[in-house]
Amino acid sequence: VEEALEKIKKKRGCINISDLAAELGYNQSYLDRLFYAATGMSMKKFSTIVRMQSAIRYLQEDKTDEVYEKLGYYDQSYFIREFRKYTGMTPRQWAKKSQKRIV
């Protein structure tokens, strides 16, 4: 489980869970059960959290329209929905709000 955690963090959450399980020599559902038992969340949920934390960092430096591609999202509207679930606002709203705090 520690190795799975580290690999997800290293890839900024941009990782295929079934490929990760195979790489670690586990069945995906078995590894996900182990992961859930150790962390209290699924690997997909953890991966999404890592991606959203990366998005927040990228939004401080990059244009909002570029961030979703850097994080491996193919659909910008899906990224916006995920970001809104995580932060309560769109990436653009978050970027504007964080710029006001910096200035």
Regions found by a protein language model. Give the residues of each.
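DNA-binding recognition helix and immediately preceding turn/loop
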Residues: V1-K44, D62-L71
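Terminal helix-turn-helix DNA-binding modules in bacterial transcription factors
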Residues: A38-Y74, K97-V103
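…primarily DNA-binding HTH/wHTH and HhH modules…
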Residues: E82-V103
